[in-house]
Regions:
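Non-catalytic helical/linker scaffolds that mediate oligomerization, partner binding
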Residues: 1-477
């Protein structure tokens, strides 16, 4: 199955999309990667969903990516007498280490790390920013605040600290357990929630040890400030606009989205734009015009993928949401302005032989209007380099590793085919031509460009480029 677009679609699975039949329908509608949110999914259910995805993969003979989204260290209040209280603007409110139920003057804050790092003047946001507090005094077991925006506080509501870097791991005990379970069933991507620093990525990579790629969810101001360092260590980025819009002013989120999309492309790392992209389609079969524009803007900016959350997980129209996103992407990419924007954003290649080869492949393919750029890749690095250049020609990645194909499912423009490794350079070119014809990317009489690393099978050794003419024999296999 060949997609008629370059941007990829990530669809979240949930109650509305947890059957094998629905997963197959979502894939047919356009989903390239399936996300499993471990905040709402048990390990047993996660294993079942991965099994269903792999069944669809076998039935369609197409690599499908599986993304596990870890819950992360969510900060929460304790409980309240009666379950809820009202706090008024201007009142004093205390957060302390006493586990007794709270009232209109105080509440239990169970994370001791907060008390030693928060400072006067810092902000606390409760229940996604509905209640805002400013710190007046900070003591080892007690924080005195002033209520800036009052409202209702109830049991175990979430707490956000946009000004405070908290000295704890991005992997809670639940996350470590979920990650190990996910690695055992062969997931492809793991998304880390609420990261603050590059060390959070390094910690996760010590656990994954190459068994899964690591995606950094940028949803805290602290992570935005250290974006360059995080990009260096992460394998991909997610613009997690939900919590990001809680912890920083909403009007700043679009600029951060553009900054991340641009930085990811320069680094050759995939970028996924997420949260509320087609939110109204939870209850409506058609999106709002603003939502269509939001998805289109992300694609115009050059995002590798756009993501559906509740729309596909818990909405009434999951298949329609995926199909709508698919149509928007196809329409945007057919616009002449899209190609102009993509070309204008192209950065100079890194000063390496592999990056020079990828840049040359793009220039040759564009100049000669070649049918496809075909990459032989073991680790996926060759395909990533070519995708960074955003050629007009389709990118076909050939890999002997199914795990590589699955990880590349989130990368802009890459259509991956799993095939045995080439025996020599002649076999490499001949098989590339046959597969390009078989997958409907080329016809006899057209030309393709083949990019690879020699010796064959050496990860990251992109050093060969060859223009190949497709003969009539290529259509016979």
């Amino acid at each position: 199955m060949r997609r008629l677009r370059r941007a990829k679609i990530v669809a979240t699975l949930g109650p509305a999309s947890s059957s094998a039949e629905m997963i197959a329908r979502l894939f047919e509608a356009g989903a390239d990667v399936f996300r499993i949110n471990m905040s709402h999914t048990s390990q047993e259910r996660m294993r079942e969903l991965v099994g269903m995805i792999r069944t669809v993969e076998r039935d369609t003979s197409r690599p499908i990516g599986v993304l596990i989204d870890l819950q992360g260290p969510k900060l929460r209040l304790g409980t309240f007498t009666g379950g809820a209280v009202m706090v008024k603007t201007g009142d004093s409110f205390v957060l302390d280490s006493d586990p007794a139920p709270g009232d209109a003057t105080r509440a239990y804050l169970p994370q001791p790390e907060i008390f030693v790092t928060i400072k006067p003047g810092h902000t606390l946001l409760i229940d996604d920013g509905k209640v805002r507090l400013t710190v007046s005094e900070a003591e080892p077991k007690r924080i005195v605040t002033r209520v800036v925006i009052g409202g209702k506080l109830s049991d175990r509501k979430g707490v956000s600290l946009p000004d405070t870097t908290i000295p704890f791991s991005a992997l809670a005990d639940k996350d470590r357990s979920d990650l190990e379970a996910a690695l055992q069933v062969g997931i492809d991507w793991v998304a880390l929630s609420f990261i603050q620093r590059p060390e959070d990525i390094a910690e996760a990579k010590k656990i994954t040890r190459g068994r899964a790629a690591v995606m950094a969810k940028i949803e805290k101001p602290q992570a935005v400030h250290r974006l360059a360092e995080i990009i260096d260590l992460a394998d991909a980025l997610m613009v997690a606009r939900g919590d990001l819009g809680v912890e920083m002013p909403l009007e700043k989120v679009p600029g951060v989205q553009k900054q991340m999309t641009r930085a990811g492309r320069v680094a050759g790392k995939p970028v996924v734009v997420a949260t509320q992209m087609l939110e109204s389609m939870i209850n409506s079969p058609v999106p709002t015009r603003a939502e269509v524009s939001d998805v289109a803007t992300a694609i115009f900016e050059g995002a590798d993928a756009v993501m559906l959350s509740a729309e596909s997980a818990a909405g009434n129209y999951p298949m329609q949401a995926v199909a709508t996103m698919n149509r928007i992407a196809e329409e945007v990419e057919g616009d002449a302005l899209y190609r102009n924007i993509i070309a204008a954003q192209r950065a100079a290649p890194e000063a390496t032989g592999a990056d020079a080869i990828a840049d040359a492949a793009r220039q040759i393919a564009d100049t000669l209007d070649l049918a496809a750029v075909i990459c032989w890749t073991s680790s996926g690095s060759t395909a990533l380099r070519v995708a960074r250049e955003r050629p007009r020609s389709p990118i076909v990645a050939l890999s002997p590793n199914i795990s590589t194909g699955r990880r590349l499912a989130v990368v802009w423009g890459v259509h991956c085919v799993v095939t045995e490794d080439a025996h020599d350079q002649d076999d490499m070119v001949e098989r590339a031509c046959r597969i390009a014809v078989r997958e409907s990317f080329a016809k006899p009489g057209q030309r393709v460009i083949v990019v690879a690393g020699v010796p064959l099978g050496t990860p990251g050794a992109t050093n060969m480029l060859r223009i190949a003419y497709i003969g009539a024999d290529a259509a016979k296999n």
